[in-house]
């Protein structure tokens, strides 16, 4: 089998940075996980990303795709942050796959922010076949901010995920772009003004809820988020109700876009969600 991986390098941190990881994400996140920088093939492009997995290789673990926020290099995940975020998730008992998206952090191609870059997420899936401890048949997906949009676009095209976690997710891209002049200019330069409304509509989950799989969705959105309005998640949930899509909406009081003051609550919600839907046996999972 031809490998989809081009490069894999384990992240090694200085003693000072290692202590900072333990302080910020916990001892387990550092001691019980391995996080790697990877380069993989996506539509013939060399794309950068990350891979994380538990140190214990004695069994297989559910797989989770984690979708970053930001556009271009703004929001790209550096190695220190990756060691914390992905190491924590791996320490909970998951194999984690994450993309920087094409055109970013040294990746080839150009970031279309919800266009062909969605393939960079879908092309993470076959990588699980090359990780012995990864269960490539049991997937969850998580997205923050722009990563929420990417998560919805991925789920529109692939219904093989068991659950999803969305944090501060953009579900109405047109509305968000109208309030974010930098992003709107980015899209105008990328798409052109003539097709702008049409293309932003295609990227907006609020317009294709009926095409999403009916899996359990955890939506967390800071009630005081002034970057992506919590109304984006509130209005999406109204659509979820119309189509009987199972979900839980949590609006942490005084929570900002990054939920800095709510990290413990958010981590517990995420951990419990994955535990419930990726690990606990349900009747439909039994053979």
Model-inferred region functions:
Residues 13-58:
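N-terminal cap/lid segment of alpha/beta-hydrolase-fold proteins
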Residues 76, 169, 173-214:
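Mobile cap/lid helix-loop segments that gate and shape the active-site cleft of serine hydrolases
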Residues 148-159:
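Short glycine-enriched nucleophile-adjacent loop
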Residues 112-132:
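Alpha/beta-hydrolase active-site loop
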Residues 133-145:
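Alpha/beta-hydrolase fold nucleophile elbow
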Residues 212-213, 219-221, 225:
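Short beta-strand/loop motif that positions the catalytic acidic residue
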Residues 57-61, 66-109:
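Short substrate-entry loop that stabilizes the transition state in hydrolases
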Residues 68, 234-287:
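C-terminal catalytic histidine-bearing segment of alpha/beta-hydrolase fold enzymes
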């Amino acid at each position: 089998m031809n490998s989809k991986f081009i490069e894999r390098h384990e992240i090694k941190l200085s003693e000072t940075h290692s202590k900072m990881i333990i302080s910020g994400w916990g001892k387990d996140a550092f001691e019980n996980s391995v996080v790697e920088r990877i380069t993989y093939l996506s539509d013939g492009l060399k794309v950068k990303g990350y891979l994380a997995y538990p140190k214990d290789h004695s069994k297989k673990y559910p797989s989770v795709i984690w979708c970053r926020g930001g556009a271009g290099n703004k929001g790209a995940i550096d190695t220190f942050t990756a060691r914390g975020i992905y190491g924590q998730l791996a320490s909970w008992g998951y194999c984690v796959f994450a993309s920087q998206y094409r055109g970013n952090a040294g990746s080839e191609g150009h970031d279309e922010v919800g266009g062909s870059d969605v393939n960079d997420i879908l092309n993470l899936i076959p990588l699980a076949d090359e990780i012995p401890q990864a269960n490539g048949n049991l997937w969850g997906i998580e997205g923050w901010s722009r990563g929420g949009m990417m998560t919805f676009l991925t789920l529109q095209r692939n219904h093989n995920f068991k659950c999803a976690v969305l944090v501060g997710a953009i579900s109405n891209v047109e509305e968000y772009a109208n309030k974010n002049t930098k992003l709107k200019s980015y899209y105008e330069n990328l798409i052109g003004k003539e097709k702008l409304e049409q293309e932003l509509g295609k990227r907006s989950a609020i317009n294709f809820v009926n095409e999403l799989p009916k899996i359990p969705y955890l939506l967390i959105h800071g009630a005081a988020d002034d970057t992506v309005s919590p109304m984006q998640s509130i209005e999406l949930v109204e659509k979820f109700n119309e189509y009987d899509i199972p979900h839980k909406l949590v609006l942490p009081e005084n929570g900002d876009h990054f939920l800095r003051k709510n990290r413990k609550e958010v981590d517990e919600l995420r951990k419990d969600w994955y535990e419930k839907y990726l690990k606990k046996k349900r009747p439909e999972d039994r053979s």
